[in-house]
A protein has these predicted regions:
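Alpha-helical transmembrane segments in multi-pass integral membrane proteins
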Residues: 1-10, 17-46, 62-76, 127-132, ...
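His/acidic/aromatic-lined binding-pocket segments of jelly-roll/cupin-type domains
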Residues: 51-54, 198, 369
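Divalent metal-coordination and catalytic microenvironments
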Residues: 58, 83, 147, 203, ...
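Residues within membrane-spanning alpha-helices of integral membrane proteins
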Residues: 12, 16-19, 50-51, 57, ...
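Short amphipathic, helix-prone segments within low-complexity/disordered or flexible regions
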Residues: 358-360, 365-376, 385-393
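Membrane-interface helix-loop-helix regions
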Residues: 41, 48, 62-64, 75, ...
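Central hydrophobic cores of alpha-helical transmembrane segments in multi-pass inner-membrane proteins
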Residues: 55-63
């Protein structure tokens, strides 16, 4: 029964890479929208970052759930910790969007507001905007709608004291299969009918395989998930979609390799990469607010002689520099405040961080520092309603 006393440094590095991929895609989007319309769009690359996030989340949450165990009350500690970690920064960004629309709506992209959309955005519930699209007010928050649904399943598993994988596997698979039935228009609840849910399952399978030290069975299971995703994509478009199976296989292989090789090569991950991974949640949520400033400023001064790739490079570099600052001075204080409110007495009497405190520090993009002191208990193709590369709407 393996234990884990140190962080998964390679997983932390993957979080940084995943967030950076999304930022690159959005930097291209902002450049095309505000500076040079000929800037190429790299939507598929952004998708890779999001799918990595989902797989990492599935992996981490299984380990966190095992760390909490099946003791009475573990489910509400888990739920409160998830809220403490995810909600504060997301609510802040959503509030900024609402305030911007109210105060200067003509200057804001996607500035339509309705009470229903605002409430749904704060509650992580899918809803239609006035144009009929399904996304929250803070555009990149669409991934958190999936994350919160996944956390709800994890909470339910802990509450009824069942192995999270045993509960989540059939539900996530059914959600993926339901993508075949999803209408072009209809209830916003169809948002969950998407095969991206299987990335969470892949991460969970990796966690279970690592805990049981059964790499061969894990690889076979991941291959089955990839084939399932390829089959679903092929059925949706009525033609063979090999890439739809290859992409989840690659994502799974990357996370699998990061987990299994961490003890051997994880120590070589630089500190600045670890810091970037720690700030990945802030990078992901904050960059839509600041990244458009670079191309907009260059356009305002008429610097159209600057090549688009220079604009994109400056934008990405600026966001990577700002993210640790936002993490330290905004994200972390907000999380600490929420933790004090929702998780009183999180520190144990011996000064060791309790499981719930460890969970609190792990956001939807977090992984490296949550899988500590664990013990064993037993045993890409997105659908049309998902914006490629998490296209920014914030």
């Amino acid at each position: 029964m393996p234990t884990r006393q140190q962080p998964f440094r390679l997983i932390q590095a993957l979080r940084y890479v995943a967030a950076a991929l999304v930022v690159v895609v959005h930097a291209c989007y902002y450049s095309a929208e505000r500076f040079d319309e000929h800037t190429p769009q790299l939507d598929r690359i952004g998708g890779l970052g999001v799918w990595l996030f989902f797989a990492i989340s599935g992996f981490v949450m299984v380990l966190v759930g095992d760390d909490l165990g099946q003791a009475p009350g573990s489910w509400h500690r888990f739920a409160r910790a998830r809220l403490a970690r995810v909600v504060p920064l997301y609510w802040l960004m959503t509030t900024i969007k609402v305030a911007a629309v109210v105060l200067a709506g003509s200057l804001v992209v996607n500035s339509a507001l309705s009470p229903g959309t605002v409430i749904a955005s704060y509650l992580f519930i899918p809803s239609h905007d006035e144009a009929g699209a399904i996304h929250p007010l803070w555009g990149v928050g669409w991934t958190l709608v999936f994350e919160m649904a996944f956390y709800a399943l994890m909470t339910l598993a802990l509450a009824i004291r069942i192995d999270p994988l045993a509960l989540c596997a059939p539900i996530l698979t059914l959600a993926a299969a339901a993508s075949l039935l999803r209408p072009a228009t209809g209830s916003a609840w169809w948002f969950y009918a998407d095969d991206v849910t299987l990335y969470f399952l892949a991460g969970m399978v990796i966690a279970r395989g690592w805990r049981a030290r059964r790499p061969v069975l894990t690889v076979l299971s991941l291959g089955g998930i990839a084939v399932c995703m390829g089959t679903l994509a092929s059925l949706r478009v009525e033609r063979l979609e090999v890439l739809a199976a290859v992409v989840p296989l690659v994502i799974s292989a990357v996370v699998f390799s990061a987990v299994w090789l961490d003890d051997r090569i994880g120590r070589f991950v630089p500190r600045w990469v670890m810091a970037g991974g720690a700030a990945s949640y802030a990078l992901y949520l904050v960059h839509p607010l600041l990244a458009p400033v670079v191309p907009a400023a260059l356009a305002a001064v008429g610097a159209y002689w600057v090549p688009w790739f220079v604009v994109v490079t400056i934008t990405v570099g600026a966001m990577l520099a700002v993210a640790p600052i936002a993490h330290r001075f905004v994200d972390r204080p907000l999380t600490r405040g929420a933790s004090r409110l929702l998780l009183p007495g999180a520190r144990s009497g011996h000064g060791r961080r309790s499981s719930s405190r460890a969970v609190a520090r792990s956001g939807p993009l977090d992984a490296a520092r949550t899988a500590t002191r664990v013990t064993v208990r037993g045993g890409m193709s997105s659908t049309s309603h998902i914006p490629d590369g998490a296209a920014p709407e914030g």
